[in-house]
Amino acid sequence: MAVRSKSSKAWLHEHVNDHYVHMAQKDGYRARAAYKLLEINEKDKLIKPGTVLADLGSAPGSWSQVAAKLTGTSGAVFALDILPMEAIGGVSFIQGDFRENDVLAQFEGLLNNRPLDLVICDMAPNMSGNAVSDQARSFYLCELALDFASQHLKTGGSFLVKVFQGAGYQEYMAAMREFFGTVQTRKPEASRNRSSEIYLLGKNKR
């Protein structure tokens, strides 16, 4: 029988007693991360009826759930992930790597020449426990997301991405500023205090 480490026991205790976990269960969201997007959207009004957006690294789907509710039938939500994701009403899901040509072709076919207003990305790599390696892998995913956003967003569009503060953070912010008129930071209350995660919001794509 496996013995839990102190850190995993602490995480389990925190998870079981987490206010946002209980809210997610009550409200029908697949993960507590839904409230991060809801809080950011309350401030920045990124998603509204009619918004056309892509959710990168969407599984298990809580951000796509929020997006589908906020865009309504007049908008469109495209979710992409290499992992499987259970269907969500109002969400077009593509399973695959968004760097691959066949996946991009599927996405562009579904987009059908509509302007893309917003790209959201809450991706994180599977953590190995090696802080240096994990940080590098995290920013690699962020760079891929920025590349996708820079290629597909309409002029004036927005990009919301999760990053972890540390090595590479300032360089990534500088890269975002090349593509967006403004780059702002967001730390929603639903983000755990001990976490180094923060959200970068690029507005007014050039």
From Swiss-Prot:
Residues of the signal peptide: none
Residues noted as binding S-adenosyl-L-methionine in the record, renumbered to the chain: G61, W63, D81, D97, D122
Subcellular location: Cytoplasm
Keywords for this protein: Cytoplasm, Methyltransferase, rRNA processing, S-adenosyl-L-methionine, Transferase
Active-site residues, record numbering mapped to chain: K162
Reactions mediated catalytically: uridine(2552) in 23S rRNA + S-adenosyl-L-methionine = 2'-O-methyluridine(2552) in 23S rRNA + S-adenosyl-L-homocysteine + H(+)
GO cellular component assignments: cytoplasm
EC number from the UniProt entry: 2.1.1.166
InterPro entries in alphabetical order: RNA_methyltr_RlmE, RNA_MeTrfase_FtsJ_dom, rRNA-MeTfrase_E, SAM-dependent_MTases_sf
Pfam families: FtsJ (PF01728)
GO molecular function, one term: rRNA (uridine-2'-O-)-methyltransferase activity
Cited PANTHER family: RIBOSOMAL RNA METHYLTRANSFERASE, RRNA METHYLTRANSFERASE 2, MITOCHONDRIAL
Function description: Specifically methylates the uridine in position 2552 of 23S rRNA at the 2'-O position of the ribose in the fully assembled 50S ribosomal subunit.
Protein family membership: Belongs to the class I-like SAM-binding methyltransferase superfamily. RNA methyltransferase RlmE family.
Name by which UniProt lists this protein: Ribosomal RNA large subunit methyltransferase E
UniProt organism field: Neisseria meningitidis serogroup C / serotype 2a (strain ATCC 700532 / DSM 15464 / FAM18)
